[in-house]
Structure formats: C-alpha cells, structure tokens
Amino acid sequence: MVSKLLLKNGCYFLFKKLFTNRFFCSKSCLLWIWLNPWYVLFSLGFALIVFNEWMAYAFLPLRWPTLKCGHTHPCLKVLFVADPQILGEIDETAFARWDCDRYLHRTFMVAKSYAEPDIIVFLGDLMDEGSRATAAEYERYLARFKKIFSLSSFQPNQTIFLPGDNDIGGEDEPITKIKVERYKKHFGSITDFSYSHLEFIKVNKMLRTYPDVPQEKKENWLRFVLSHIPLLGIPGTFSYEALNELKPDFIFSAHDHKSVHLVGNTKTGERSFIQPLVSNRFAGHHPSWIFFPPSRDTVNEIIIPTCSYRMGSNFMAYATAYIDTQRNVIHYSLLTLPSRLLHLFSYLFFFTICFLVSIIQYLSHLCRQPQIKYVQIRSD
C-alpha cells in the first residue's frame, strides 16, 4: 500500500513538475517552434518515413492471427495470392508501377516468411494489362512479376498459377489462342495437381473448361477446385456442370476483390448461403475460421480478396489454409495488409503543411522588412 502511494505521489510530482515548468508552458517554447519550424518538420517527416516505409511492414505479423492446425496432426500449408494485377505501361506512370511493385514485394515476403507455405496458389489476374500487352511488354511484365514474388526461390511443384481475365481476356477483351498459349508457355498448362492427401483441380470459367478426373475421390483426400471467377457467385450452366462432375469439397476463387464465404449445392450449382469474411468474433475478432468437411452434395466456396492497393478495395490480404490432413479440417486465415493509399495521403498532407509553412515564413519575412520613407527637402 505504501509503495503504491509513493508511486502515485511520485508520478503526480513528475507530471506537475513537467507541465508547470517554464519551458513547456511558457511562450518561449511556442516562440522557438515558430522561429524554427523546419527542425520540427524534419523530425516529423523522418518519423513519418520510418513508420510508412519500415514499421508498417515489419510489425505486420503482430496483427495477424496465429496460424496452426493442431499440435499432433500433420499440417499442409497453402498460401493464396489473389489478383496482384501488377500495373501496366499503358495506363500507369513509372512511379505508380514502382510503388505498387514495391508494396506487393514487401508484403508478400513478410506473408511468405510468416506462413511458411508448402504450396503457393496464384488465383489469376497476375497482370493488369496482360491481355493487351505486346510481346515485348509481356516479357517486361513477366520479368517484374518474377522479381516481385521471387519465383526463382521456389521449387517447380511449389507454385500453382491460374489465368484471369486480365491475363488472357474474357471480360473486356476477347480471348484468343495466342493469349492462351502465351500464358501456358510461361505459367504452365497443368490442370490438376496432387500433394499429400490434397487434390487441386483448375477450372477455367472464361474458357468453360475443366479436366476430366474421376468423380470418386480417394479415401481421406480433400478435393480443392481452383477458379479465378467464383463458381457460386452467379449460378449458371457451367457452374452446375463443373460442380456436378468434379464434386469438390472446397472452392477457392478470386476476381471480386472481396472476402466472402459461399455455400452451394453440387447437384444444382445454386448458392444457399453467403457470408462476408472480415473478422470472426469467436476468434477474438481475428480474421480466422475453421472449416470442416462439408456434408453430402454441399460445397464451400471461399472468395479471396486482392493483395493490391490499386484495385479500389479498402480490404487487402493474403490468405492461408492450414489443412489437418488426418481430420480434413481447414484452418483458414487472412493476413490483412496496410493501406498504402493512406501512407501516400499522409505524405501529401505533410508536404502541404511544409508548403504552407514556407508561405507563412515568406510573408512574415516581408512584414519584418524595414519601411523606407523618402522625405522631400525643399531648396530655397
């Protein structure tokens, strides 16, 4: 009790001394700031740069959920990258391309280090202008893409790529054989892939194609369908055919730049449930969920948000799926990303303050200049 009283009185005395000190409360402090604003602005600018360019990325893991799938069961780790859409040379400036590439690279490297994935799945729209690019432009975009995501550091069977409408056409541009073959040349044409009790099957809703695989799944295996465009988003004939033939346990898709969970029927292709995935109050409001194997004729589809800040979305993230291969339980989490636009606006605000201070100082300097009066002397 005595120690608490001494601590309380000591803190009170310190704050009283601090805020009644002449330097802090007198006009001399404000006068010093008024006469030397650039010292203050330099300190604030340095702190702003350190936060925006280093701390915002270095401390990302502190805000991410703990990734786990049990202590005693083997775990397969998958990292999903949706709609990176590296900017093109037609619509964007060199600075915009450089800043967006840098953002994608830094956030991806932190996410990869945190998730330690066995497999990385790129869910399409790898390039923003891939469908419109000439051969020379495409080669430059490809080199940038490989550098951003450090593709040379991965094993060939560690990455899976899906084409999006911005890669081969399909939404605003026509799909051509040249575009499709160019994509296959650089990113592969494998349509199904197996890894440790997990089967990945690629579905292309734009080309309306999917591989011919046995309907009967292997015992204790999970079947994942990967599609750039959601299959349960807008029900149609193709979705019905694909779901009825493939009978997946889970669908992972992108394209909408949103984080959504859908539930549908594999026989009819119709959606029966929709839920935004932003935070989970049962997991301490962290973006983390647990999905169990679906019941018969039911499928879960998870739409993964974009990882680029240039896609018009305020919610960017990478996604992870930690799969318990013995119980077939999926621990799904979102690795949310900082708002780069907010960082850029903070720079704009800071430079605006600097400009206003310069104007005020200039006007103040003019006001302090001595006024010279001329007196006319008569000569008699």
Label each residue range with its predicted role.
Residues F51-A56, P74-L76, E116-D118, F154-T159, ...:
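Loop/turn elements at helix/coil->beta-strand transitions in domains of secreted/extracellular proteins
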Residues V2, W34, L41, G45-T66, ...:
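Binuclear metal-dependent phosphoesterase catalytic core
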Residues A58-G70, S131-E219, F273-N300, T320:
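Extended active-site neighborhood of metal-dependent phosphoesterases/phosphodiesterases
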Residues N220-D256, V260-G284:
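Active-site-proximal segments of metal-dependent phosphoesterases and phosphodiesterases across multiple
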